[in-house]
């Protein structure tokens, strides 16, 4: 009689360039990965042209338009492009594992 076990691994990445990999060494396993992306505080330096540093204080990206339009990439709060907002990626990996027969 084999028992199936389910394991959930959650990881939060603050950098979009961070890559992670999961490996399994079991005889019978399956996994799925779910990623949620959100854009938080704006990091645009509004004083760069005068040699200073000043951000506008926008805390979270809110799309100015519906998905598929140009305004979907512009923040309704600060007017900046979405790329100026820090990207957070929440990744959840769900694995189902059946131990090998002994």
Curated annotation (Swiss-Prot):
Subunit structure, as described in the record: Homo- and heterodimers. Interacts with ZHD1, ZHD5, ZHD6, ZHD7, ZHD8, ZHD10 and ZHD13.
Keyword flag Cytoplasm: yes
Biological process per Gene Ontology, one example term: response to brassinosteroid
Region (Disordered), start-end ranges: 1-34
Ranges annotated as biased composition (Low complexity): 14-32
Organism: Arabidopsis thaliana
Tissues in which the protein is found: Mostly expressed in roots and stems, present in siliques and seedlings, and weakly observed in petioles, leaves and flowers.
Gene assigned in the entry: MIF1
Protein name: Mini zinc finger protein 1
UniProt biased composition (Basic residues): 1-13
Broad class of the protein's primary localization: cytoplasm
């Amino acid at each position: 009689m084999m028992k199936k076990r389910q394991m959930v691994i959650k990881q939060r990445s603050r950098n979009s360039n961070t890559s992670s990999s999961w490996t399994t060494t079991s005889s019978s396993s399956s996994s799925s990965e779910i990623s949620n992306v959100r854009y938080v505080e704006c990091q645009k330096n509004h004083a760069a042209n005068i040699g200073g540093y000043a951000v506008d204080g926008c805390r979270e990206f809110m799309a100015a338009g519906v998905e598929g339009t140009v305004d979907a990439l512009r923040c309704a709060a600060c007017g900046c492009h979405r790329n100026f907002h820090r990207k957070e990626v929440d990744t959840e990996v769900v694995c189902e594992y059946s131990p090998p027969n002994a």
